């Protein structure tokens, strides 16, 4: 993997552009996937009905201009005017109803909803807190890699987490954001579900995959 410079984007600080914000929302191809295993088989539940909202304090033209310069290697102007290559960390919030997850099995879906206490805590939520360091550009894949901190809400419990994310510009109005988060259900007070009088037992390990297509709102 060939990597480019450590790009100091998405950092707090002065920026040389107007403050007209850009709002992005989740497109139809977005999904959040929960994956785990039991003593019998692996399981997977996928949710596509969600509210995801990102607000960047920079106009869309500036965001695209920064990406253009990075991908063209034309960044010399930032050596004397680094503020032109910056914009603040976005505000981002994701909410997905637990009842929207589909596992291909109604019994499994019911077990998952009970385990996550969907009646009391109907949503899985994530709120972006901060960017950890800079953004690395992979010259071979065109992906941007970073580590972010945020708050994950699951089954009524909230935990601050760090997660590695990758981002890609699909077009000048759409961006793909992907992250894979391994965690333990018990960290959120969730008892791994059982079925058939305890003969099938889910394991504690859970992987949450975020695969979001964010589109600039009109």
Residue ranges and their predicted role:
Residues 1-4:
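Positively charged n-region of N-terminal signal peptides that target proteins for export
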Residues 8-17:
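Hydrophobic h-region of N-terminal signal peptides that target proteins for export
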Residues 17-218:
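Low-complexity, acidic/polar, glycine-enriched regions of mature
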């Amino acid at each position: 993997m060939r990597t480019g410079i450590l790009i100091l984007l998405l950092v707090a600080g002065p920026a040389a552009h107007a403050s007209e914000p850009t709002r992005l929302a989740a497109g139809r191809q977005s999904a959040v996937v929960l994956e785990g295993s039991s003593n019998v088989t692996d399981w997977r539940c996928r949710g596509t009905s969600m509210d995801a909202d990102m607000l960047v304090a920079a106009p869309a033209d500036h965001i695209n201009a920064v990406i253009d310069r990075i991908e063209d290697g034309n960044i010399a102007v930032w050596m004397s005017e680094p503020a032109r290559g910056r914009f603040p960390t976005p505000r981002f919030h994701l909410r997905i109803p637990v009842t929207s997850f589909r596992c291909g099995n109604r019994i499994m879906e019911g077990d998952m909803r009970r385990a996550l206490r969907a009646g009391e805590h109907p949503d899985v939520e994530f709120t972006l807190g901060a960017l950890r360091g800079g953004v690395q550009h992979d010259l071979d894949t065109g992906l941007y890699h970073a580590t972010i901190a945020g708050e994950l809400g699951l089954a009524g419990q909230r935990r601050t987490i760090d997660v590695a994310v990758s981002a890609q510009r699909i077009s000048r109005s759409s961006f793909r954001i992907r992250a894979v988060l391994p965690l333990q259900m018990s960290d959120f007070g969730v008892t791994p579900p059982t079925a058939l009088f305890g003969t099938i037992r889910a394991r504690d390990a859970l992987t949450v995959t975020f695969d979001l297509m964010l589109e600039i709102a009109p």
